[in-house]
Amino acid sequence: MSATVIAGIEVPSSSLIRDVTELVQSSAPPLLYHHSRRVFFWGSMRGRNRGMTYDPELLYAGALFHDLGLTDRFSGSEQRFEIDGADEARRFLLDAGVPPERAHLVWEAIALHTTPEVPWHMAPEIALVTAGVELDVLGLGYD
């Protein structure tokens, strides 16, 4: 399987990333799946342009899972959709053997992706999920 590269950004190719992709692609409608992929690419480009160092796997997981709480399969709790998605991402990542602190970082990225400004004061992966969402949905940061 060849790597997917768009605008010089390569999608990580680990088994974890393949499993994340499979789950989201099978759970979300195509519009949401493709939006989530764009969030990864936009966030990665923003990070590259700002000279930020980040973990592409964590950014990809955060980007792909960030709207999973909007899907029929993962919504329905009394929580905000961001928390539903963040909880599922953390569960999935922990079950896959991701260390708790890395899974929590993805949880924070997803939980805060609709909160302007705050993520920029946190870990790069958290900031870049939000940056990718803002660019794909609102055009913020397109310069």
Label every model-predicted segment.
Residues 1-7, 27-33, 37-52, 98, ...:
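Divalent metal-dependent phosphate-bond-processing catalytic cores, especially two-metal-ion Mg2+/Mn2+ enzymes
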Residues 3-21:
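Short alpha-helical hairpin
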Residues 10, 91-92, 110:
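Alpha-helical, largely C-terminal catalytic domains
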Residues 29, 49, 71-79, 96:
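Short gly/ser-rich anion-binding loops that grip negatively charged ligand groups
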Residues 35, 52-58, 97-109:
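Acidic/histidine metal-binding catalytic segments
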Residues 39-40, 80-95:
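An active-site-proximal "capping" alpha-helix that borders the catalytic cofactor pocket
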Residues 56-75, 81, 85, 107-116:
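His-Asp-centered metal-binding catalytic motifs of divalent-metal-dependent phosphohydrolases/nucleases
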